[in-house]
Amino acid sequence: MKKGKCVIFIIDGLGDRPNEKGLTPLKEAKTPTMDKIAKEGICGLMNAIDIGIRPGSDTAHLAILGYNPYEVYTGRGPLEAFGVGLDLKEGDIAFRCNFATVDENFVVLDRRAGRISPEEAEELEKEIDGLEIDGVKVIFKSSKGYRGALVLRGEGLSCRVSDGDPHEEGVKVSEIKPLDDSEEAKRTAEILNKLLKIVYEKLNNHPINEERRKKGLPPANIILPRGAGVVPKIEKFSEKYNMKGACICGTGLIKGMAKMIGLDVIEVEGATGTPKTNFMGKAKALVEALKEYDFVLVNVKGADEASHDGNYELKKEVLEKIDEMLAYVFEHINKDEVYFVLTGDHSTPIEMKDHSADPIPIVIWGKSVRVDDVTEFNEFACAKGALHWIKGEHVMKILLDLTGRNEKFGA
């Protein structure tokens, strides 16, 4: 049996709840290609992690790729650090960071330091990256201006520490505290508190910040770490599935997740992770990637952004653009060679402006699937499909079976 190639195409924040007319953006959107895929595939509903669990995009993607998020997800920090291109090692402690503005009493005046430019951030980065405190190496990389990632590398560290970011302005930078009684957590908290003071001393009168003050702009004179996580021991995708895999996405969080499990990240110009992303660029990149890779993960983020803004019409427009994107893809792939999963990672209902535990429609398309009677791709039609109701952990198992890659259990 020839082993087929696999695509998991995730529309971030796909699912929704019905409005007063009983409609969702997906049900109301004109999506002829998605409907055709549903008509030619096997449909159902999926909860990425489990029924009743509101997943983050990171934990949902891990689950769909067959990784137990309760075992390998330690926090957002490592994913952000991988996402900005840092080369992390097992045991590193990683954090998300903002450049921020504080006064001489460490009261936060601006959590984003007036949204400093990437060029300014790169200069300030040099003052932090490479520091050493109590035998622990400090690694820092800025990303998209005021954002960045911080990594501590050394012995006797723990991710069980609180945030330095108070998450509001007009209050002091939070003293970082251990979240358990371990010596490792106490040591890590002490190192971080020392680091923040050193960073302030190095950045406060830096030429970049002196120039910003002259222009009436807030100085970027501290970093605020949050979301601590330890880089886990994790089986790489190629070892786990014996497939060469890639990822196409625009958002740093998903890029970081992909890099953590060893997927090659394919960069697409104009792929922004927003409703204004380069949809067709991603579609063409997917078609090209299938010439080289056995497996491709695609994430398209725009619908989720629209949901978080509570913008029903924009979500509908994004879904229609994704449908055009899929039309191009399906003109260029062979049903005898590719198994295609179309789904989301979670629901983001317009009414909530946040993730919910509502299940997501899913369809699996390919030559050997048992086609059911579903003719539309939406939350209601897919509920009647022969795939019924599955969890994210089942997706890769189904693909491995369809492509002849799984092992028989028993005689």
UniProtKB/Swiss-Prot annotation:
It holds the Pfam family PhosphMutase. Inhibited to approximately 20% by EDTA. Optimum pH is 8.0. Pathway: Carbohydrate degradation; glycolysis; pyruvate from D-glyceraldehyde 3-phosphate: step 3/5. InterPro entries: Alkaline_phosphatase_core_sf (IPR017850), ApgAM_prokaryotes (IPR023665), Metalloenzyme (IPR006124), Pglycerate_mutase_ApgM (IPR004456), Pglycerate_mutase_ApgM_sf (IPR042253). GO terms for biological process: glycolytic process. Keywords: Glycolysis, Isomerase, Magnesium. Its cofactor is Mg(2+). Its EC number is 5.4.2.12. Transmembrane segments: none annotated. It is an enzyme of class 5 (isomerase). One of its GO terms (molecular function) is phosphoglycerate mutase activity. Belongs to the BPG-independent phosphoglycerate mutase family. A-PGAM subfamily. Homotetramer. This is 2,3-bisphosphoglycerate-independent phosphoglycerate mutase 1. It comes from Methanocaldococcus jannaschii (strain ATCC 43067 / DSM 2661 / JAL-1 / JCM 10045 / NBRC 100440) (Methanococcus jannaschii). The gene is apgM1.
